[in-house]
Regions:
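Short low-complexity stretches enriched in small and charged residues
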Residues: 27-36, 144-149, 282-290
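Generic structural hydrophobic/aromatic packing signal, biased to beta-strands
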Residues: 45, 77, 110, 128, ...
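C-terminal, surface-exposed recognition/capping segments
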Residues: 2-11, 158-162, 173, 177-180, ...
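Charged, compositionally biased non-catalytic regions
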Residues: 1-30
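Extracellular adhesion/carbohydrate-recognition regions
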Residues: 32-116, 201-241, 327-330
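Flexible loop/turn segments at secondary-structure boundaries
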Residues: 127, 198-202
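Short secondary-structure boundary/capping segments
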Residues: 133-138, 198, 207-209
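Short aromatic-cysteine micro-motif
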Residues: 60-186
Length: 334
């Protein structure tokens, strides 16, 4: 089937706030507006090809930049973890992020913001993480009750809650690109619900591209399973069930099993540039129990210390789960 025509985004409506943000960030950031007219700060992530970041990811545009078969020249990721105002998810600096929210309510608040807005997807998170890997910069964050566990002199502004800081209040090293123009708080602070990835009976389910409007029951089976062997093993069969965990960098495939390239592109199995590298941050937890349906959250929280990171992933909680250390982030594709 022929690929649909690529489209290019042009933002035509100037205003003082948008202009000031774009000038301050050198064009890396902008301000979009929700359907109710509220400003929301977004970081522009230009598209790239899989072969640009790793040799074993295949070729062609990374799936984060393909939405239902349509190529996108960029995606917009909320610069800050979301708050909810008037029913809509907003990205604003120096706010206490919304937490104690379940997956469905987080997703609904993002959609309520207007056309193209959605809960950040696993494909989008993977793309940003690959960018960090390729550029040799792994952001730190609030991983120890308001400060970095590895650099305790680096702190954010505390909210009224014990470990939560105000969005974007940390240092440059808490941004995805090491500058104040980058996406803040991806590591630590609060875990972030992620759309486009589920673990059901140990089977990995995800859309084939960044089609954030596709119903979950239409997602294809990725063809792989998580087996609770040697921590976490990617396999075509399950021999052991239950809660299990592993450093992302150390996740391996069953001997003789050829991992689909899509799983590497989706950060579910490490590519060669990540595998076994001790400097790669992020721990993975999963529950492959029978009849267990797990939604995904990523990044870690303010209590997770060294296990937090851009490669951190939790696949052991139901979508109905709601905790003080789980929040979310919006994204948009035009």
């Amino acid at each position: 089937m022929a690929k649909k025509k690529s489209n290019t985004t042009t933002i035509l409506v100037p205003d003082p706030l948008r202009k000031s943000v774009e000038l301050a960030t050198g064009g890396k950031g902008t301000v979009l507006y929700t359907s109710k007219g509220y400003p929301t700060y977004m970081t522009i992530v230009p598209s790239f090809n899989c072969e640009d970041v790793a040799d074993d990811l295949g070729t062609g545009k990374h799936p984060a930049f393909i939405v239902d078969g349509v190529d996108k020249s960029e995606i917009f990721i909320a610069t800050y973890q979301s708050i909810i105002h008037d029913g809509q998810a907003l990205s604003l600096p120096y706010q206490r992020p919304r937490t104690s929210i379940n997956f469905n309510d987080a997703k609904a608040a993002c959609i309520e913001a207007g056309p193209g807005f959605h809960l950040m997807t696993n494909w989008e998170w993977a793309a940003i993480s690959f960018w960090c890997m390729k550029n040799g910069f792994f952001p730190r964050g609030n991983t120890d009750y308001g400060k970095s566990h590895s650099h305790p002199d680096k702190v954010g502004l505390r909210s009224r809650d014990y470990g939560i800081t105000l969005t974007g209040s940390g240092p440059d090293t808490w941004r995805h690109d090491g500058t104040m123009s980058g996406i803040s708080d991806l590591v630590g602070h609060v875990w972030e619900w992620i759309d486009g990835l589920q673990l059901i009976d140990g089977k990995i389910k995800m859309p084939s591209d960044n089609n954030f409007c596709q119903p979950e029951n239409k997602w294809p089976d990725a063809g792989s399973k998580i087996d609770a062997v040697n921590g976490i093993q990617i396999s075509d069969a399950i021999t052991k069930r239950g809660w299990t965990s592993q450093w992302f960098r150390d996740i391996a495939a069953k001997e003789g099993y050829d991992v689909p390239v899509a799983l590497k592109r989706a950060l579910l199995c490490p590519c060669d540039a990540i595998a076994g590298k001790s400097e790669i941050p992020g721990y993975v937890w999963a529950d492959n129990s029978k009849k267990q349906k797990s939604a995904a959250f990523r990044g870690g929280s303010f209590v997770d210390g060294a296990t937090a990171g851009v490669f951190a992933l939790d696949l052991k909680y139901a979508p109905s789960s709601s905790y003080c250390y789980i929040g979310f982030r919006a994204a948009k594709a035009l």
